[in-house]
From Swiss-Prot:
InterPro entries: AAA+_ATPase, Helicase_ATP-bd, P-loop_NTPase, Replication_origin-bd
Keywords, ordered alphabetically: ATP-binding, DNA replication, DNA-binding, Host nucleus, Nucleotide-binding
Gene name tied to this protein: UL9
Span of the signal peptide: none
Organism: Bovine herpesvirus 1.1 (strain Cooper) (BoHV-1)
Biological process annotations from GO: DNA replication
Descriptive protein name: Replication origin-binding protein
Residue span, Helicase ATP-binding domain: 70-235
Localization of this protein: Host nucleus
Pfam families the UniProt entry points to: Herpes_ori_bp
Protein family according to the UniProt entry: Belongs to the herpesviridae OriBP family.
Function: Functions as a docking protein to recruit essential components of the viral replication machinery to viral DNA origins. In the presence of the major DNA-binding protein, opens dsDNA leading to a conformational change in the origin that facilitates DNA unwinding and subsequent replication.
Annotated ATP binding sites: A83, P84, M85, G86, S87, G88, K89, T90
Amino acid sequence: MTATPGAAADAVRVEGAGACSDGGEEARYASSASLARMLYGADLSERVRRRHPAVCVEHQSGRPVALPSPLAADARRVTVVRAPMGSGKTTALLRWLGEALGATDASVLVVSCRRSFTRTLHERLRDAALPAFATYFDARSYVMTGAAYRRLLVQVESLHRVDEELLGDYDILVLDEVMSTLAQLYSPTMGRLHRVDALLHRLLRRCPRIVAMDATVNAQLVDLLAALRGAGSVHVVICDYASAGFLQRRCTVARRLGARVLAARLKGDAEDGAEDGGASFFTRLRARLEAGHNVCVFSSTVLFSELAARFCLTFTPSVLVLNSTRPAEGDVSRWRDVRVLIYTTVITVGLSFDHSYFHAMFAYVKPMSHGPDMVSVYQSLGRIRSLVDNELCVYFDSSAARPEPVFTPMLLNHVVAEDGGWPATFSEVTNLLCCSFRAACAPAFRGARGLALFPRFKYKHLFERCTLASASDSLNILHALLENNRVGFQLEALRSAHRRGILPLSRGRARRRPAAAADLRALAAGIPSPVSAEGLAEHPAVAAFADKYLRAGGAPPAALEELLRALNGPAARARFVNLAVLGGCLHVPAAAESLEVFAGIYRHYASGEVPVLTEAGAVETAALAPGLRWKPTALFGLRRMARALGLLRRRGGGEADDVADAAHGLTEPAIVELVGPPGGHDYAQCLLEIARCNITPAGVMARGPVVAVAARLSGRGFAQGRGVGLGAAAHAVSVFKVIWEEVFGARLQKSTQTFPGHARVKNLRKHEIVALLDLAGIDRAGRDTHRELYRLLMSHKARFASPKYSLRLPKWGRLLGFAARGPEPGPDAPPEASLEAALARVPALHWPCAAGAVDFCAL
C-alpha cells in the first residue's frame, strides 16, 4: 500500500472522526502511538501543569517515594502519588500515617480494590505499630458503625456497609492503588454500583485529607480531584524511582510457544522438540529447569497454569500452583520452599515477594474478551520484585483475538513512533480508528443516571476491555506499562518494524496460532476429570438453579454437567444469562412494549447465584450482579431478530425438547435486513456496552486503506483486493456474527447448501419450491406439478449460489425452561413459575393496555 500523507488523510477522513476533530485536549485521544501511555499517566506532569497551574507538582528521582509531611504549614488537603511498583509507596504511606496519627487522634478510612490487598495492608499497619485498624472481615454485623470502626480498611464493593453517619466523620481517606479501586466500579461483582459510586464521590468531595496512590495515576484522576476540591488543594508527587529488581529486568517476547516441546515432554519422548533452536517459550523454560534453576510462571488462564504445572512436574516435584481452582495460599514466605511457582491473576496487588530467589520469570499472556486485561497482567507480573538473572520471557497467545475484519487494531507501538515514526499510511488510519472509538464511547451508558464517578472513567475501562480483541493492541499496552516500571522491553526487530509496516509479533502468527491452540486443546483433554455427572441434580444449589432456569423434567445428567462446567467461566455465565433474558422476552411479548416488564425479566434472570462445576469437580456458586449492560431498545431489536430466525421455538409435531436452536440457509441480503440500516438499532453500541466489543463503523471499514492497515497490524499480511474496503453486506455479516457469538454464545458458519432454508432440496414441498422460484424472480408459467417446478428450480441453481450461513445456539440453549413451551405465548403457555412470580410484582399500569384495559393476551 503506497500513499502520500495527504492522500492517506483524504482517504480515511470519514465518520467517527468528529470526537477528535476539534484539536486541543480531544486530539490526544487521536494519537494512536501515545494513547496508551497517556491513559497510564506518562504525560501527567505536562498535562497537569497546563490544565491546572494551581496544582503543586513535585518530581522525585533517584530515591524511594516520599510523601509531603501532613504537619507542614503548607501541606495541601489532597496528595496524589504516581510512582512505579516497588518504589516504596506503601512504606511512605505508613510513615505519613504514623506522623499524622501521632499528632492527632484522627479517624482513617482505607478503601482497597482487593481482599488480598486489604489483608496485606492490615498486616503492614499492624507491623508498623500504628493504632489498631479494623477490617470489614471482622465485622459481626452487616452495617459497620461505632467507635470500633473509626480506623477501618474496607474493600470498595463493601463501602455501602459502612454506617452513613460514620462515613461522613472520617478525617483521612486513603486510596492505595486508586486506579484499580476506581476500575472496580465496572466489575461484574459490583452489586450496588449506584450506592458505592455516590458514597465514594461524597468521600472525595468532603473528606478533610486524601491520599491517593498508584503506579498509573493519570490526568483524569487529577482533573476529578481538582474539580471536587479545587486545584489549589492538590499536591501531585511524580516519582520515577524503580528498584533494581525492575530496573535491571529485561523482557523478551518469544515468537513461538513450543507446544510440541510441551507435548513431547508430557508423553515422555526423548526427542522433545529441540528443533526450534531454543527460541520458544517451553524450550527456554525447559533449559532453566534442566539447569536446576528456580522459576516462576504467570498464566492468563487457569488451563495453561495446569498444563505448565504438568510440564514442570516432569523435572521436579517441587511445584506450587496458585489459581482459582486451588486452595488459596496467602503466605508468600512459602514460595521460597518450592522450585517452581505457577500463578494466575489471583496473585495481584497486595502480595509481593521481595527475595531474590527465582532465577527467571515466564509469562503466558492470552488477550481475550473475558480474560484479564493488560493492567491486571502487569500488576501480577510485578508481584515478584527481584529475579536472580533478571530475565522475563513473555509469550503472547493471539488465538483468542477476534478474526472478524470489523475488529481493527488501533494502536501503534510508541518505540517505533519515536525511532523514525510510522508511515503516514499507518498513522492516519490508526489515528482515525482511535477517534472512531472515542466517538463510540461518548454515548455509552447514558442510561446510567445518578452516577458521578462511573461516567468519568468509562473511556479507560472500555479501552482496556475492547483492546483485548487485538493481540497487537494488547502487546503495545503491556509494553507501555512495563516501560512505566522501567523494565527493559526487547522485541525482535522492533525498531525496523515500520519499514515492513507490520509488528514483528504478528508476522506469521495468524498462520501458526490455530495449530498451537489445537495442540493445547488436545493436551487439556488429557487432564482427567474427577467428577461424575450422577447426583448433580440433587445438589441444593443445582436444584434451585434448575427450577429457575431449566425446563420441567430436568436435563440429562451429561448435559447438566457440561452446562455447569461451562458456567465456571465468566464468559459462558454472561452468555447464559443473556440467552435466558432473550428467551424470557420472546415468550412474554409485553416486554417489547413496557420497560418495567423488561426490567422484571432482566432482574429475574440476571440476579442471584448460579452453580458452577470447578475443574476440581466441586460444586460452587457464582454471584450474578445485574449491572448496566442491556439497552432495552437493543434487546427489542435482538428479540425481533430471534423471532425472524425462529429460534427458541418448538418445532411443530416434535418432542417436548425438539426446540429450534438453529437457523440455516441465511443469505447475505437476509442478514443485512436483520441487522437493519445504520439508522436503525445500534447494535455496535449495544456490543460495546454489553460485550465490550469495539465494532469499527461501516463507513470507516468501507475505505481501502483502513482494511489494508488493519490486516497488516493483525498479522494477516496484505488484505485481499488491496485498496478495496469492506462492503456493507460483509460488514453486516460480521456484526451479525459478533452479536450472536459474543452475546449469546452461538456459532455462525458458512453453509455448503445451495438453497436458503434448513430443509434439503430433495425434501422441499411444492409451495416451498414456488416460494424459492418467486424469490429469485424465475418465471414458472406453465409448470404446475411438483416435478416440473423442481426441474425448473434445479435448472436455475446458479442463481442461488451466493454465500449462505448457518447459525446455531449453544447446546445448552435447549435446556432453558421457556424453550419447551408452545410456539406462541398465550394462556396455554405461561412463563415458568418463578418468572411468573417475579412479573407479578410489576404493577398493572406498566402492562400493555387494549381499549383502556390490561391486554391479557400479551401477558
